Every structure is written in structure tokens, then in C-alpha cells.
Amino acid sequence: MIEPLVLGLVMGLVPITLAGLFVAAYLQYKRGNQLNLD
């Protein structure tokens, strides 16, 4: 049985982690385009 606190923590951290990775990848991609790098 999963504790509600742990479940809430995971449900809160997962979207933030995915959003952070997406933003980091987007910024790196955008920076690469500005430098004309493939």
C-alpha cells in the first residue's frame, strides 16, 4: 500500500521534472538554432 504523502509527492514531482526537462531541451534547441548548429 502506497502512503498518500508519498503518492502526493510523486504526483507533484513528476510533472515538474518532465516540464523542466522539456524546457531545458527547448532552450538548448533554440540556442542551437541561433548559433546555426545542427
Curated annotation (Swiss-Prot):
It is a single-pass membrane protein. The keyword Oxidoreductase does not apply. It comes from the Bacteria. It is found in: Cellular thylakoid membrane. Belongs to the PetG family. GO terms for biological process: cytochrome complex assembly; photosynthesis. GO terms for cellular component: cytochrome b6f complex; plasma membrane-derived thylakoid membrane. SUPFAM superfamilies: PetG subunit of the cytochrome b6f complex (SSF103446). The chain crosses the membrane at residues 5-25. GO terms for molecular function: electron transporter, transferring electrons within cytochrome b6/f complex of photosystem II activity. It comes from Gloeothece citriformis (strain PCC 7424) (Cyanothece sp. (strain PCC 7424)). Keywords: Electron transport, Membrane, Photosynthesis, Thylakoid, Transmembrane, Transmembrane helix, Transport. This is Cytochrome b6-f complex subunit 5. It holds the Pfam family PetG. Disulfide bonds: none annotated. The 4 large subunits of the cytochrome b6-f complex are cytochrome b6, subunit IV (17 kDa polypeptide, PetD), cytochrome f and the Rieske protein, while the 4 small subunits are PetG, PetL, PetM and PetN. The complex functions as a dimer. Component of the cytochrome b6-f complex, which mediates electron transfer between photosystem II (PSII) and photosystem I (PSI), cyclic electron flow around PSI, and state transitions. PetG is required for either the stability or assembly of the cytochrome b6-f complex.
